[in-house]
């Protein structure tokens, strides 16, 4: 799931230290690197759930071959997730939604989550993020109650979702915890990680410039 860079405000919490153009370039790199990673997985159908709908022609030109496009529906994240799973599970036996904000996430974990759902090992798969949310959520059947009255954009998203899932009698499996990039501290962590261990192609190409920008921001 992603906002289309250039059509919606992206990475607003990183402006400053980044300019609007730098934030847009970063979000684009994150998105395309994530799509490349999903396309490389076997046994999955890669789809980009995007907003706003007007971005479809641009995203169709940008997305790797084999990636389908699906415009998000609904108001607010909870309603959008509900609609997304309604759409996907009408045609597929399981679906796993991913963020586009954790570019160095090991894609083997995504494959593990997809396999858990496909093999019937869980009703819900969640990939926790360090900020208290999740980088992934997967389902085998639509479940609107899982996304209703959740305190989105807080550190209680994962906790609330787990409590809700268990109250509904759903079998939950957790994937490893990872970080997403929303704040200046997150961006520094990403740049340090790429400098030490590398990263996906587009994001890694931007990392030296971003690290220099962060260093200038500290000096200034």
Predicted region positions:
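Short phosphate-binding loop-to-helix
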Residues: 58-94, 154
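Conserved donor-nucleotide/metal-binding helix-loop-beta segment in metal-dependent transferases, i.e.
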Residues: 105-131
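A short, N-terminal amphipathic alpha-helix
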Residues: 25-44
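Short, glycine-/small-residue-rich phosphate/pyrophosphate-handling segment
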Residues: 143-164
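Catalytic metal- and UDP-sugar-binding loop of GT-A-like glycosyltransferases, i.e.
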Residues: 98
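Conserved alpha/beta core of the MobA/IspD/sugar-nucleotide pyrophosphorylase nucleotidyltransferase superfamily
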Residues: 160-220
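Short beta-strand/loop segment that forms part of the nucleotide-sugar
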Residues: 43-52
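N-terminal nucleotide-binding beta1-loop-alpha1 segment
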Residues: 1-14
């Amino acid at each position: 799931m992603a906002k289309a860079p250039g059509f919606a405000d992206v990475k607003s919490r990183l402006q400053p230290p980044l300019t609007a153009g730098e934030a847009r370039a970063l979000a684009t790199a994150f998105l395309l690197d994530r799509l490349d990673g999903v396309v490389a997985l076997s046994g999955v159908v890669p789809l980009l759930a995007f907003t706003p709908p007007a971005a479809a022609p641009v995203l169709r030109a940008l997305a790797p071959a084999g990636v389908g496009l699906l415009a998000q529906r609904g108001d607010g994240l909870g309603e959008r997730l509900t609609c997304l799973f309604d759409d996907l599970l009408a045609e597929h036996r399981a679906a796993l939604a991913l963020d586009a904000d954790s570019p160095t996430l090991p894609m083997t974990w995504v494959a593990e989550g997809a396999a858990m759902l496909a093999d019937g090992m869980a009703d819900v798969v969640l990939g926790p993020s360090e900020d208290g949310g999740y980088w992934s959520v997967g389902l085998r059947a639509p479940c609107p109650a899982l996304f209703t009255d959740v305190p989105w954009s807080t550190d209680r998203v994962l906790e609330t979702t787990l409590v809700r899932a268990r109250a509904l009698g759903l079998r939950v499996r957790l994937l490893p915890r990872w970080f997403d990039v929303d704040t200046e501290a997150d961006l520094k962590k990403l740049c340090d990680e790429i400098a030490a261990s590398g990263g996906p192609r587009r994001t890694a190409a931007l990392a030296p410039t971003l690290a220099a920008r962060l260093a200038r921001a500290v000096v200034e």
